[in-house]
């Protein structure tokens, strides 16, 4: 009975800040690696919501029916002590300014 609710995909947002120990020339590769990791775990594309100019701080949206704790645990393994991340479930889009790609992703999921 309740299992159909558990299988409904939910939308999530992850904010990731790579530590100062990551050399600037490796930031892009690390961000892409983390995006690919999340994409493989959730079995769908991950939408980059924003990236700081140096790519040390990024935000991404993803959708999954998987237990979010599985994704959290894998992301924890893939990051270092100096990295930081926050993941949360996303509700309805309340509005946006200048974030059309991210807003469009939210509106269509």
Language-model segment annotations:
Residues 39-82:
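Short, intrinsically disordered low-complexity segments
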Residues 2-34:
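Short S/T/G/P-rich N-terminal loop/turn motif that feeds into the first structured element of a domain
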Residues 33-34, 73-77, 101-105:
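Short, aromatic/basic amphipathic alpha-helical patches
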Residues 14-16, 60-63, 87:
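Short beta-strand element of the conserved SAM-dependent methyltransferase core
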Residues 94-109:
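Short, low-order "capping/linker" segments at domain edges
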Residues 83-94:
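A short, structured active-site edge motif that brings together acidic residues
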Residues 25-27, 31-41, 51-52, 97:
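A hydrophobic alpha-helical transmembrane-helix feature that marks the membrane cores
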Residues 21-25, 69, 94-97:
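Short, surface-exposed beta-strand/loop "edge" segments at domain boundaries and coil↔beta transitions
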């Amino acid at each position: 009975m309740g299992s159909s609710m558990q299988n409904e995909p939910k939308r999530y947002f992850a904010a990731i800040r790579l530590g100062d120990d990551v050399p600037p020339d490796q930031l892009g590769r690390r961000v892409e690696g983390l995006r690919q990791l999340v994409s493989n775990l959730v079995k769908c594309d991950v939408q980059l919501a924003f990236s700081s100019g140096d790519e040390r701080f990024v935000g991404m949206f993803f959708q999954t029916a998987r237990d979010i704790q599985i994704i959290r645990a894998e992301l924890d393994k893939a990051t270092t002590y100096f990295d930081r991340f926050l993941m949360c479930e996303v509700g309805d889009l309340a509005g946006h300014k200048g974030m059309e790609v991210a807003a469009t992703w939210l509106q269509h999921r």
